[in-house]
Amino acid sequence: MQIRELAERILFGDRWEEKLVALDRYEDSAPGTAFVVPERPGRPVGLGLDEWHGREKMRFRDVGKLHSERERGLVLHFFANHELLALELMALALLKFPDAPQKFRRGVVQTLKDEQEHVRMYRRRMEEIGVEFGQIP
């Protein structure tokens, strides 16, 4: 798969299959032209940035008050949001800077893959304790 195709799927995908697409081998022979920054990334239902307007915001939990699995799951939700945004920013960097040195682009791809794995881990743990990704603005 071309790096550009991967980055576009991640940045604009509105399904987890797109955001977390596995990448074993990739090519960078067609990086294309520099990309214009979109207004917002594509997101799975419930996680769209525009969907959070008007919803009550939750404050980050006080670490000393994390007595239940559910409370810990809500903290994981905050972390998972951070990882998802980092994943999308790595994809954007690949699209925005197609002429960057190959070593840099390969490093960004590796970071992107790491962020995908972090999102997977958070989603798995949240699912185990009954917290759905997207339920907290």
Predicted regions and their residues:
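Non-heme di-metal
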Residues: 1-137
